[in-house]
Amino acid sequence: MENQINKSAEKSAEKSAENSAAPVIDFNKFRPTRSHIAARKRKDMLMRVLIFLSFVVALIPLISLLLTTIINGIKRLNFDFLTHNMTYVVGGNATGTGGYGGILHAIIGTLEITLGAMVISIPIGLMCAVYLVEYARGNKISRIINLLVDVMSGIPSIVAGLFAFSMFALLAGPGTINGFEGSVALSLLMIPTVVKSSQEMLKIVPNDLREAALALGVTKQRTITKIVLRTALPGIVSGCILAVARVIGETAPLLMASGFIASTNFNLFDGQMTTLPVYVYQEYSKLSANCPANAPASCVTTIPMERAWAAALTLIVLVLLLNILGRVVARVFSVKAK
């Protein structure tokens, strides 16, 4: 009797042990097979090829533009072209120096007008960004200012030129045209870009830096100038360079606000000034130069187009130099870890 009881107890114990045992999972069922691995590799290779082709397609217009400009512009781009203006240039005839005119006046006009626009727009845009991020974050005023900045970023460039022309006509008299007027027109186009880029860079600065400075008793103004702006300086400089590249190629507002002359004008506040984009437009609109039947052999009918391509190449090089300068400045003044 006792043996039967023991056997039944052993059987019940075995059954309970079997029921309480953890289930055995066969992981071999989840192991990828060779066909699955090969399919994954094919998909990975396909995506790599598609991404590379997309990159190549995106590069084709840029490379084509650069090659076309270099091939057509390098023929006329020389020292004489860079150091002379269009004074005494008639048709396709050579001047007394043996050249065919140049872009010295356009280079000076471009640099002065762009510098004037930077002096106006960068302080205004940077102070606006500091106010939006450090003082008025999330309130009603900041939302209104952001809306106005978004509206300004969508203003056509010709409208900015018309505004500057109308404003100076009211302040200085009808028909007033000078380089500073062009700077005002370009500053209207630069300010939204400076505000947006600076605003994003200031938001990236960690709040821990602000809180640590304030905990040490540093004033808010000094925290902004010495810590926040210093930390965000590389991004701010890049945004300003982007804004300059945005406006340095504008033509329509400068045709209205700054005009076009053949001589060199160094005075930003008096008289018309020529910029490189306006120069390209003026030369391209000529299509060809007039060479009469009795003209000398040095007369070149295609000289306007050659000058236009050379000026366009100079403008591209100028933008490239500005980008390099901006990167150098950002690297020099950036915060370095010790």
Regions found by a protein language model. Name each.
Residues 254-316:
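Interhelical loop and adjacent transmembrane-helix boundary motif
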Residues 124, 137-141, 206, 210-238:
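Amphipathic cytosolic juxtamembrane alpha-helices at the membrane-cytosol interface
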Residues 116-149, 170, 327-335:
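Transmembrane-helix boundary motif in ABC transporter permease subunits
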Residues 1-104, 108, 112, 292-317, ...:
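N-terminal, non-cleaved signal-anchor transmembrane helix
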Residues 118, 197, 220-258:
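Transmembrane alpha-helices
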Residues 150-188:
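Generic hydrophobic transmembrane alpha-helix motif, especially the helices
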Residues 100-131, 240:
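Transmembrane alpha-helix signature in integral membrane proteins
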Residues 46, 103, 107, 111, ...:
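Hydrophobic alpha-helical elements at and bordering transmembrane segments
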